[in-house]
């Protein structure tokens, strides 16, 4: 049997590792992954297309109600969105606050030696270089996570761009896929953009530390992302749609999130439903171990137990 899964391009490397490993254990089931983006994946699942979907944002309530269909939104792993930049020959680690990052993406801070940046980074010899803003195209989960955070720390960003998979960016160049953005940033002095932590690490791009809700500058890492999940209220929330951005706690990385699997509670075909349930059972056991080995922050134990229990109801 071939199961069709759509979803975000950010966790694609992990999902492909899962799919390969699962096929070795369950040879009769293949999973085909199509990285169509979070918004498109949600539309597909609500329309009855595909066996499971996924994305880096909760499905909008209006779409869920309009579809009149029971879809489970199950956290798969934790991810962090990191601010990445290209400043050749400039030593040091860039520090940013949420409001400063918001003003960069609003096009209000235009050069790297702007006083808002030099105040935060007195030890970096920031150049009089134009800032080139890179962002993702519409319908992307990374847009949602970043804009969710920026809307919490910047009233101006909330008013102008908004919290969305398709923010109204007033400035910058857009990219369809995360890897395209990273590749272009590498070869563009003065560029700033964002991507998922593991892709940033594997690509060797520089990442900024972000000031969190407790006033600490925190580097993105699987540990600081896990700290945000532990502090961010995911434990208490049974529907798993909770936002983890700007979480409390000194060690919390502030642009952290679940990435979700969108799963029809009842499959149109019982045999396919059983196959999806078996795959999910594997994801929340062996799959979590693989995610940890690949450097992802896995679900806290109490959240994992609740998610696995919910996943077992799929049929």
Region locations from a protein language model:
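Flexible loop/hinge segments at secondary-structure junctions
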Residues: 1-315
């Amino acid at each position: 049997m071939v199961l069709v899964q759509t979803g975000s391009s950010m966790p694609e490397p992990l999902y492909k590792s899962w799919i390969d490993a699962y096929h070795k254990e369950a040879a009769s089931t293949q999973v085909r992954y199509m990285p169509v983006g979070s918004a498109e994946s949600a539309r597909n699942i609500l329309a009855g297309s595909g066996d499971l979907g996924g994305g880096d944002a909760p499905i909008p309530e209006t779409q869920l109600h309009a579809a009149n269909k029971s879809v489970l939104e199950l956290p798969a792993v934790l991810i962090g969105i990191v601010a990445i930049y290209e400043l050749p020959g400039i030593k040091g680690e860039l520090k940013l606050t949420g409001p400063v990052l918001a003003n960069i993406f609003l096009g209000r801070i235009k050069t790297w030696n702007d006083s808002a940046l030099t105040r935060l980074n007195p030890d970096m010899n920031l150049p009089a270089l134009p800032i080139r803003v890179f962002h993702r195209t519409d319908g992307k989960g990374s847009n949602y996570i970043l804009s969710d955070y920026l809307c919490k720390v910047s009233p101006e960003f909330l008013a102008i761009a908004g919290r969305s998979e398709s923010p109204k960016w007033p400035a910058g160049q857009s990219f369809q896929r995360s890897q395209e953005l990273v590749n272009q940033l590498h070869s563009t002095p003065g560029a700033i953009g964002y991507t998922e932590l593991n892709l940033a690490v594997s690509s060797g791009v520089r990442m900024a530390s972000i000031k969190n809700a407790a006033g600490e500058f925190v580097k993105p890492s699987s540990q600081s992302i896990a700290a945000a999940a532990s502090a961010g209220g995911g434990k208490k929330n049974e529907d798993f749609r909770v936002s983890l951005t700007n979480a409390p706690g000194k060690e919390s990385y502030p642009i952290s999130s679940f990435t979700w699997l969108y799963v029809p509670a009842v499959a149109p075909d019982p045999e396919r439903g059983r196959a999806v349930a078996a795959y999910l059972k594997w994801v929340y056991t062996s799959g979590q171990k693989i995610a940890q080995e690949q450097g992802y922050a896995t679900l806290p134990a109490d959240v994992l137990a609740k998610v696995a229990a919910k996943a077992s109801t799929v049929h």
